[in-house]
Amino acid sequence: MNSTQGTVGSDPVILATAGYDHTVRFWQAHSGICTRTVQHQDSQVNSLEVTPDRSMIAAAGYQHIRMYDLNSNNPNPVINYDGVSKNITSVGFHEDGRWMYTGGEDCMARIWDLRSRNLQCQRIFQVNAPINCVFLHPNQAELIVGDQSGAIHIWDLKTDQNEQLIPETDVSINSVHIDPDASYMAAVNSSGNCFVWNLTGGLGEDLTQLIPKTKIPAHKRCALKCKFSPDSTLLATCSADQTCKIWRTSNFSLMTELSIKSNNPGETSRGWMWDCAFSGDSQYIVTASSDNLARLWCVETGEIKREYSGHQKAVVCLAFNDSVLG
């Protein structure tokens, strides 16, 4: 290793993982080598997201969001957003980096203006149950919010109007995602079901309309995450059943099951599959699980290509960005 070691932000591939051991780790995706570890004091990390310009990473934890600089080796957060009373479960960014959105167990989704020197949130959307997940529609104008009561809220940021749907009453919505083409929305819940809708509208003044497409009994245990691939042809679902399943969006049939179940009869569960992210070419997927590992898999064959070992406790979230800015 030479003395002019590059920073995480200079690497064309950013892979970061975090969870219950109060650290965020950065990895060389191809080699499995941990290149940097930053401490995240006082709290587990629930969600990670890289800013659109790849200069910083946001870590959402208990009562705060911390921003770490990817273009230096500074081990401390460069910005702290506080003033939230409970766990922050979800974080993401507007595509041009103007603002950040979060959701949390205080039943609020928030918008934070990243250009403001005032580190207070600018807008709040209140619901009646703790929020597990928030995702920004590709039109950058609607926030999709999933809560523990089983409701999915569509918050129109232009008009401040909102609509809601409840695919399964009193079953917590744990993850929502929209594919890059804005053709489909998926949501997974604690009974292991995955719901898919066709999307129409969402342009100009029109609020997005959701037309039920299918319900997949994806897992027999709690489903924790759903993600569409960048090319919109695949949907991944992660679960407490120790699997991540890959579904074809052409007919929502199962293509591949990625399992961390042990073949040893005496070995108990290796834990939950918490999070996943596809590579930019949709050929690979990284998973985070509570056996302290992240793994890189080949989507087509289900083969493990790399393991990322170093966390001392469960890995519950990751950020994977292999897009090269033009």
UniProtKB/Swiss-Prot annotation:
The keyword Membrane applies. GO terms for biological process: regulation of actin cytoskeleton organization; TOR signaling; TORC2 signaling. Pfam families: WD40 (PF00400). SUPFAM superfamilies: Quinoprotein alcohol dehydrogenase-like (SSF50998). PROSITE patterns: WD_REPEATS_1, WD_REPEATS_2, WD_REPEATS_REGION. Its main location: membrane. It comes from the Eukaryota. WD repeats lie at residues 1-37, 40-80, 83-122, 126-165, 168-207, 218-257, 268-309. Keywords: Cytoplasm, Lysosome, Membrane, Repeat, WD repeat. It is found in: Lysosome membrane; Cytoplasm. GO terms for cellular component: cytoplasm; lysosomal membrane; TORC1 complex; TORC2 complex. CDD domains: WD40 (cd00200). Coiled coil: none annotated. Belongs to the WD repeat LST8 family. Part of the mechanistic target of rapamycin complex 1 (mTORC1) which contains MTOR, MLST8 and RPTOR. Component of the mechanistic target of rapamycin complex 2 (mTORC2), consisting in two heterotretramers composed of MTOR, MLST8, RICTOR and MAPKAP1/SIN1. PANTHER family: G BETA-LIKE PROTEIN GBL, TARGET OF RAPAMYCIN COMPLEX SUBUNIT LST8. Subunit of both mTORC1 and mTORC2, which regulates cell growth and survival in response to nutrient and hormonal signals. mTORC1 is activated in response to growth factors or amino acids. In response to nutrients, mTORC1 is recruited to the lysosome membrane and promotes protein, lipid and nucleotide synthesis by phosphorylating several substrates, such as ribosomal protein S6 kinase (RPS6KB1 and RPS6KB2) and EIF4EBP1 (4E-BP1). This is Target of rapamycin complex subunit lst8. The gene is mlst8.
